[in-house]
Amino acid sequence: MGLPFLCHTRVCLFSNKIPFVLCGSRFAPATLHAHHTAAGGGETLNFPELSSPSTSKEPSVGSDSPQKKNKKQAFDALARWCGGHQQLLMRIQQSAEDTSAGVVFETPLTEVDSAAIRWLQGSTEQLTCGQSLLVCSFVCEVLYCQLNSASGGIGVEEAQRLQIHALTNRIAALLQRADESNKLESQPLSVLMSCAYVVQRLKYVDNPLFGETQRSLVKVPPSIMFALLHKLRGDGLGKLFQLDERTATDVCLSFLFIATEEHRQAFFSSGDAALVSNVLRRLVRYTASKTRRMRIQKEGDIIDLLTVDSPSDGGARQTPVCTSGTGFTSPSMRECAMIMQNVSFSSPSNRLELLLYLLCVRRNLAQCSLKDIELVPTVLSTVANIRSAEACSIRKKIISQLWLPENNPTLVAQLLVHSGESIPRYVTYLQGVPASKLSPRDAAQVILCAGTYLSYESLQLYIMAALRDIMPSSSLVTLGAETTSASVPATASVPTRVPACDSLETVLSVLLMRVEEKGGSLSEVEKDACMEYIRRLNELIDWCASAPTSSPKPALQRLTLLTKLFNRGLVVHAPETVVELAVQSLQLDPGNTMMNTLKCVSEALPLVSDDKKRSIIIEKMISYSGTRTTSSVIRFLLLLAPLVDADSPHSCELVEQLLKFHTLNPHKLRQASVEGVAKGIDVYTLLLINGIDFLLASGDWRSSPSQLQNVITTWVRDYTLYVMDPARKQKIDDGAAAHVAPATKGEKTDVVQHQQPSRLNEGGELPTLSGPNDEELEQVFTCLLRAGVKLPHAFSSELLSRIRRLQAKRNPADGTDQQVVFPLPAHFVFCCKLDVPVEVSVTPEMMKYHIDACDYRIIHCVITAFFSAAGTFKHNINDLLLCNMRLASRSFELFIQRLGEEASRSFRPATVSSVVANTLRFVVNHITKQERCQRVLRKLNEKGGIEAGEEELEGDRSLIAEHTRLGELLTRMIAYLSGAHVKNVGLSVLDRLSLLSPACGEYLMMRLSTQLSEFTQVELLYLVQKYPKSQDLVAELLGKSDLVSSMDFGDYMRVMRNLPMPINALVIGAHLPGLNFQWCTRILSSLSVRHESVPLHLLASVLRRLNDVTESATLTDRNIAFVVLQKYLQFDQTSGDGGDLEERQRLIKCSCDKLLVLSRINSLDTLKEFLVEFPEALSGVICESLSKHVVQHIVGGLLKDLDGLLTLCRLLHRHKLLTSDVKVAIVDGFFMKTLQSEVEGRANIEGESSQGLQPLNSVRGASLKTTHPVSNVLALALLLSDGPLHFPGASNSSSTICGDNERCAVSSMFQVVKESYTSPRDRLLIANTLVGQKGPNALTVVAKEICTELIENCESVTSNDFSRLLQCISRLKCWSELDLANSRFDEVFQRSCTQADAHSRCVAFRAVSFEADIFRRYESFMIPLLQETVDVMSNEDLETVLSSVLSLPFTEALESLIDAIGTRLLRMIDQCRRSALIRLLQCHAAFGIQDDALVSVCVATLTDQCGRDFRLDTAQVLALLQAAVDLDFFLPPKLVTSCFTWLEHHVENMTITQLGHAVRLAVDVEVGYTAAVHTLTLRALEQRDAIRSNASFREAVEMLCDEFSAEIPWHLRAPVLRRRYQSERLLEYLDKRRLAVDSTVA
C-alpha cells in the first residue's frame, strides 16, 4: 500500500533529522536501492558492520560528526536492505504473471539479512521511541516481502522459518520498546501511522510460516493506537496537509485501513464515533480535483468499450479508458477492499468518491493482475447497497477498464452482476463457454450472477450443469422435456423428490427474477416456459426435508424464495421449515439490512397458518427490531404494528415508548432515511395510521383511553401543520415543474449536473416532498374517528380545498357532463364536525355511497353526520320528527344491507355488535332528545294511537307509517347485538327506545330477560329505572336475595329518586330496621322529590324509625332533619286535596315535636343560646311551637322590664320568629297594662277631674316624667308594628282593645305611647321618628295628630325644635291640613327663624320650599335671613339651600341668594364638596344665570379633582353634564371622559330614566363614539320593552342612532328605527293618497 516511504530520498535519508514518515509508495525504497547498484547484471549488497546509534544528548559539533555519520549510514543501510527485498518481490510478482516458466531467482540478500538481524539484536535497546518506530517499519516491510516471496524446498523452508522467527522477535522487541516510552504522543503523526500500518498489514498475510504464534507477537500496541487518536483529534492531520499533501493522503488511507471494527470497539471512545467519517471527508475533499477528471470522462469512450465484442482469442487485454499517469501501484486490491469495508457506515457519496479514487486514480485497472481482478467484485460489493445512478456509473466505469479474464466464467459473471446492465462482451463470453465442462458449483455461481442476462437456451444448459449431481439424469431429462412441451405425457412417472439445496434455490431465484423482470427482453412465451420450469422444479423439491442452512443470510434467501413461490400460486407446504427459516433469518447481523430482513419475514407469514407459530415469529421480529430506540419504533410502526396482537408481551413497552413521542414526523425524530417504504407512499401518514391503529388495539386503550387520546391529539396537531405547510406544497409544485421541463443544454448541462453534489438513496430515502393523497388522508380521518379525537379547526380550510379540488378533478372544466361528486366518507364526517360547507345534499344516493364506501368501524359516525348535514330545523314538530325518522330508516336499511353483504368477510361478530350499538344509541337519543318530539311520540304510542293520530294530524298518515317502519328496522338492528351490547344498550337507551317504539322496547326487554339473572343488583335498579314495566321481574329477583347483606345502600340511594315506588318500598323495608338517623334523613330527602307518590305506609315507617333513633342524633343532624320535614310541610300546603293529607301532616308534626326540645328554654339567655345554634332556614318548622313556648314561659316575666322586652323582640325579629302571638302578648301586657297604668297614676297625682281620664292633648304645661325612655318605647312599638298584628276577636277584662283590626291595634298602641309622653320635645321626637318609617298608615295619622297639637301650642317650642317641626310637616305634606290662620304661627315662625342658628334657618327654608304658596308667604322674610348667615353656613347647609332653590320659581331675591352663595364658594373653592359645586352649576343652568367667572372656577376645580378619588353618584354626573349642555360652557375632555367612564362602570345600576338621560347627553355633549358611549349604547339598545313603552326613552335612543349611524351596526339600529321608518312611510303614503284624491276631484 502507498504508505511506507517518501519518494523524496534526500528528505528521507540525507537530512539532518530522522524523517517524519516512511510513507509514500510501498516500492519507493526499491527505487532508492537502484541508485546504489549497478545498472544491469546481478547486484551485491554489503551490509557493513555499524556501531550502535548514539543516544547521547550532548550537542554534536558540526554536521559531519561521527555520531551523525553513523546514524546516516545505519538508516541508509536499513533503507537499502528494505529496498532490496522489495525489488526481489517485484520481480517475483512480475514473473508470476508471465507465461514463461522455469525462471529461478536466487536470493543474494541472505548474508545481508543475517548482518541486519545481528545489528538489530544489538541495537534495539539503544534506540529512541521515534527510532524504534522507524526501524520497526523497515523490519515489518522486510518480513512482509519475505512472507510473500517465500519459495519451496525442505532446506530453504527451514532457513526461512528461522529468519522469519528472528524478524518477528525483533519486531516484538521494537514495539515493546516504543510501548514503554512516554514520548509516543510527541512523535510525528506520519511515523506513528506508518508503524501501525505495516504491523496491521502483517495480520492479513497468508503463509504457513507465519502462524498464530507469530501473529500474537506482532500486534499494534494500544499505546500507539491511543497516540494516533490523540493526534487525529487535534490539528495534526491539518498541519500535515499544509506541509505535504501527498504524505497526508497516505496517512488518511493508512488510518482507514487500520480502523477496523475490532479496533473501533477496542480503542474508540464515544466521542470518536465520527472520527473515521471526518478523516474520510478530509481525504475526499483533497482528492476531489483528481476524481473530478474521472467524472467528466466522455461517456462515448465507455459506451464504445461496452459495445465492443470480445476478441477472437478471448484473452487479449483491453486498452484502458483512462490511465492513472501517477505511477502508483498501491494500495493493493486487498487493501482497497479492507478500506472500503471499514468505511461502510459512512456517507454514500464519500464512499463512492473514495472508491473512484482508489481504483481509478491510485491504480491502473488495465494493468491489474488476475488476482487483483478476482478481488474487484469484493471491492464493489462494499457499495452494492448504494442504488443510485451515480453509483451505477462508477461501477460501470471500473468494470469497463478491466481486461476479460481467460477460462474463468465465474469471475466474468461476478463482474457482470456489478455492472448494473448487460455488457455485450461479457455476455457473449458466458454464452460461448461450454456449460457441460463446468463444475456444478461454478455453473450455479454463473447462474446466480448472470442468469438474468443470458439467453434462455444458455440458461437451460447452465441449469443442467448445476443440477447434474443433485438430481438423477432421468429427472433432468423429464424436466427439460416438460419445459419444452406444454403438457406431461400420461405415461410419465412421478419423479423422485429431492431436498432443497443452494443450487436449486439459485436456479429458482434466477428464474423468478427473469419472470418478474419488467420491461425486459423476454417474450411472453419465454416467461411462460420459465414459469412451467419453476412449477416442475418446485414439484421435485422436498422443502420439509431440506438441510438446515448454515447461517442467517442463506436462511433469509431461502425464506424469500418460498415467499415468491407462494405468491406465484405454487404449493409450498412447509410451515415448520418456514418457522425455522424465519427464526434463523432474524439472527442476521442488523446493519443496513434490518428493514429488509423484517420485510422479508413479514411477507412470509402467510405461509404459516397456525396462529401460535405466527405469534412466535412476530415476537422474534419485535425482539430483532428492538423496542427502546426511536428507529426501532419507526420500524415497528412501518412493518410490525399491523401484525401485533394486543396480548403481545412487547405491547406495553412499545406503547410506553410511543407515548413519549410528541410527533411521528420522521424528520423531527431525526430519521433521515426510512427503508422498506414503497414509492408514492407518504411515510409520515403511514406512521400515523399504524401508530393510532396500534394504540387502539392495545390493552392501554381500554384501561386509560384519555391519556392515549391526548397523545394522539398532539400527533394530529403536528400532522395537520405538516399537511397544510405551504413551503412543502411549493416544493412539490417546483419539483413537478422541474421534472416536466426538458433538458436543452446537451453536454454542457451534463457537466453541470456532475458538478452538483450527489443525492444518493441508500436503502430507500424518505421522500421529503411527498404528502398524503385523498385515500391516505381518509385512512387518517378514519383512525381519528375511531379514537374519538377532534380535528383542529384550523384544518377546515385545507379540508375544503381538498374536497373542491377532488370535485374539480372529476368534473370537466367546460361544464359538460357534470356529475355529483361525493366527498370520501371520513372527509364528509369531519366536514360536518368542522362546519365546512359541502355542496352535497343528503340524498339516498349519497347515503348509499358513504355507507358502502366507509370503514365499517365508523358507520355510526357517518350516520351521525347525515343528521348533522340534513339540517332538520323545522318549526313544525311533526315535520321535524318525520324528517328524522325517514333519515334513520334509510340509514338503517343501507346498514342492514351492508351487514348482509359483508358479514362473512368484512365484519367480525364483535365488531358488528359494537357498531350497531353505537348507531342505535345515537339515533335513538337524537330523535327523542327534544321534549316536543317526545310529546308527539307519546301521542302516537297511546292506545288507539293510529286513530288519534289521524284525527289530530289531519290525515298526515306518513308520520304514522314512518313510525311503524322505523320500529321494524330498529327490531332488525337489535337482532345483531351480542349479549354484552344488549345489556349495554338496554341500560343506556331503553327508556327512550320504548318511547320511540314500544314494540322494539319490549323486544329488547325480552332479550334482556334471558340474562337478568347475571345482572348485579345495581344494574337491576338501573334497568327498572329505564323501563318501569320491568318492576315485577326486578322485584322478584331482588326478593330472592338478602338485600341487607348483598346490596350496598349507598349505591341504591344514588338511583332511588327515579325508581318505582314498589321497588323503593321493597329495598327500604329490608334495610330500615338497621338504619341510623342520618340514613333515615337521606331517605326522606330523596323521597321528598316525589312526595306526592310516596305511599303513606312507607312514609310512616320511615318517620317511625326516625323517631326511634332521635336520641342518638346530634344537633346538626336534627337541624338537617328539620330542613327535610319542612319541605314536606310546604309541599302539603301547596298540594291539592287528598284523603291522607291530614294524616301525613300529623305524622310530620309529631316528628318535628319529637326533634324539637323546648323544655330547657326558660329565660332570655337560654333562648339566645338556642337560637344561635338553630339555623334560620328552619324558622317555619319551629315558629308556632316556639312562639307558644316563649309566650308562656318568657314574656310574662319581662312585662316590667322594657330592656328585656326590647332585647327579646329584636332577637325574635332577627331570627324571623316574632309572630303575632308574641306581639299581642307584649302589646297587651306592656302597652295596655303597664304603660297605661303609669298614665293613669300620673293623672291621679295631677288631680284631674274624677269624671274620667281627660285627653292628654288638653294638658297644658309640663307633665311628670315617665319611668321608661321614650326612645326604647318607640323602638319596641316600631318592632311590634312591623308585620301583621292580630288581636283576639273577643274582648276580656284584662284588655282594653276591642276588635282584631290591625290598623286599630297599631293606632291604639301608639296612642298609648303618645299619651305617655306629653312634653313638646318628646312629642316632636315621636313625630320625627314616625315620619321616617314606612309602616302602616296608622303611624302617619299619629304623626299628623302630634304635629297638629304642637302647632297649636307652638309658643312653648324652642326655635330649633320649631325648625324640626316644620321639617316634619313638610315631610308629611300636611300643610293644607293645618289651621295656620287660627294660630299664632306667623309670629312664632318669624321669631323662631330670627332666633335660630344658620343650620335651623336652612332646615326651615327647606321645609317651606316644598310648598310654593307657603314659600311666597314668607319669601320676603326668609331670603334676607339666609343672606345674613351665608358666610357661616357649612358645606352641607349650602348644598341644602341650593337643592331647595331648584324647586322654586325664579325671582330676584333667589338670584341674590344664589349670587351670595356663589361669592362664598369662590372664597372657599378648595374646601368645597363636589356635590355643592355641581348643585351651584345646576342652579345656574336651571335659572339661566350667566356667571362665567364662577362657572369656569367650578369647572376647573371639578377637573382638578378628577384625578384623585373621583367619586360621584349617577344623578350628580348627569346633573353636571346637563348643566354643561344648558349653560353651553366648555367642559374639559378630562372631566367629560371621567363622567362618561363613571356612567359606563355603573350602567347596570341605572334606571331607565337615567339611562335615557345619559343617552341624550352622549349626543348633546358631543363626546364622540368612545368606549364608554359604546357601552351605554349597547345597554340602551337592549331595553326593548322601554323602547316600546317609554316615549322619551325611545326618542333619546333614536337620536343616538341617528347621531352615530356609522358606528352602530345596522342590525342593532334597525329595531329602534323601524317604528319611525314605518311611521314616515305611512305619512308619505297618506300624502300621496291625499294628492291622488285631490287630483281626482279637481
Curated annotation (Swiss-Prot):
Residues 43-69, 745-772 are annotated as: Disordered. Keywords: Mitochondrion, Transit peptide. CDD domains: MPSS2. It is found in: Mitochondrion. GO terms for biological process: mitochondrial mRNA modification. Residues 49-65 have a biased composition (Polar residues). Its main location: mitochondrion. Residues 1-27 form a transit peptide. Disruption phenotype: RNAi-mediated knockdown at the procyclic stage causes moderate growth defect and reduces production of guided RNAs (gRNA) due to a block in the processing of gRNA precursors. GO terms for cellular component: mitochondrion; protein-containing complex. The keyword Cell wall biogenesis/degradation does not apply. As part of the mitochondrial 3' processome (MPsome), involved in the maturation of guided RNA (gRNA) precursors. Component of the mitochondrial 3' processome (MPsome) complex composed at least of terminal uridylyltransferase KRET1/TUT1, 3'-5' exonuclease DSS1, MPSS1, MPSS2 and MPSS3. Within the complex, interacts with DSS1. This is Mitochondrial 3' processome subunit 2. The gene is MPSS2.
